[in-house]
Design a protein with these regions (language model features):
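N-terminal leader/signal peptides at the extreme start of proteins
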Residues: 1-22, 88-89
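Intrinsically disordered, low-complexity segments enriched in polar/charged residues with Gly/Pro
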Residues: 3, 9, 15, 32, ...
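N-terminal single-pass transmembrane signal-anchor helix
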Residues: 18-56, 63-64
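Intrinsic-disorder/low-complexity peptide segments enriched for small residues
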Residues: 12, 22, 32, 36, ...
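Internal low-complexity, small-residue/proline-rich segments
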Residues: 44-349
Length: 349
């Protein structure tokens, strides 16, 4: 009797266990449902991350604007993009009139006091080293390669990047005004000017209408590959006029262009088109690749556009300290007007 009873209970457990088990079909269905949910949720998570990074990118650009306003309150001028050259004829060295530097050199005291101390302790040696290299500025101790978080947009994916923001040198390709058309001369007057510190009175269009800094992603840091959106190259021909610069950079951007440079953003202390300057010749995130006439030097003519990894826009900091997102689809005449401190009617172009 007891044995029969135990056998009955055992058989009941087996039937219950079989009924409670999961079939192969149920496993497949469950995996399919989970995959579907993941495919729906993952883009939302990525989108949230992208928005968060873009917001922090704006915040860091705003900090740069605050630092520029502090500099303005202290000196009455915005930072320079170059310092006087050093003249040393005793050793037969050639001299340079200006040494291209980043405006962040003068803002760093408000952003990172420790790095600022290092810069100004070595100022004398730095100037002599710069002059000796004839416009190839490489500060000692790799100061410009010090990683300062506020200078790097969180969206940047290259670990070597040290600078995600650049100074607006105007809406014309050249930093020199001789030989330009009248319209291009007006466009060349950016928030920053090579060799001069700009005062508020020089913003004829108003500081709230002129971009001070904008984003520019780094190069791909791969010397064996040319990435048109990230990298730049040396353009062949006269690039002083806007239309000519657009045509040269567009047509000469072949698979292996002349002197491609993949190290944009490697240093926040250097000046020049390859390091910390940009212009409004082409629109934000332009499909026209960047190029410059004097690719190894700070000055010369260039098309160097604002570029970001955000979907459809770049962040721009204005001279009054405000920060705005500017869509890729902005009319080019409006974008160029935002790049100059001259009072230009964007509808007249």
């Amino acid at each position: 009797m007891n044995r029969s009873h135990h056998q009955h209970r055992y058989a009941h457990r087996l039937r219950t266990s079989a009924a409670a088990g999961i079939s192969l079909l149920e496993v497949v269905v469950s995996i399919a449902v989970l995959s579907l949910l993941l495919s729906l949720v993952a883009p939302a998570i990525l989108s949230m991350r992208d928005r968060s990074q873009a917001l922090e990118c704006r915040n860091r650009l705003r900090q740069l604007g605050v630092a520029a306003q502090e500099r303005l309150a202290t000196t009455g001028k915005f930072p320079k993009t170059s310092i006087p050259g050093q003249f040393d004829t005793t050793a037969g060295n050639a001299s340079v009139a200006y040494i291209s530097t980043s405006p962040f050199r003068e803002l760093i005291a408000s952003l990172d006091s420790n790095t600022a101390d290092m810069i100004f302790q070595n100022e004398g040696d730095w100037g002599r080293d710069l002059a000796a290299t004839l416009g190839h500025p490489f500060p000692p101790h790799d100061l410009g390669k010090q990683k300062i978080p506020v200078l790097i947009c969180p969206s940047e994916t290259q670990p070597q990047a040290r600078l995600s923001y650049r100074a607006n040198l105007g809406s014309a390709p050249s930093v020199h005004r001789s030989g330009m058309s009248q319209q291009d001369r007006l466009h060349s007057v950016g928030a920053f000017s090579n060799g001069f510190a700009i005062t508020p009175a020089q913003f004829k269009d108003g500081m709230s209408n002129t971009v001070l800094f904008s984003e520019r992603i780094s190069g791909d840091f791969d010397a064996n590959r040319y990435s048109p959106f990230r990298d730049s190259f040396r353009g062949q021909g006269n690039m002083m006029q806007v239309d000519a610069a657009m045509e040269i950079c567009k047509t000469q951007a072949v698979v292996t262009p002349d002197h491609p440079d993949s190290e944009a953003g490697k240093d926040w202390l250097l000046g020049g088109w390859l390091s910390s300057w940009y212009n409004h010749v082409a629109g934000p995130n332009s499909t026209v690749p960047d190029c410059a006439s004097l690719h190894d030097f700070g000055g010369g003519d260039a098309l160097l556009s604002a570029r970001s990894l955000h979907a459809g826009f770049v962040n721009a900091g204005f001279a009054d300290g405000s920060v705005k997102s500017v869509a890729d689809e902005i009319a080019i005449d409006v974008w160029r007007a935002m790049g100059t401190r001259e009072a230009i009617d964007s509808q007249s172009e």
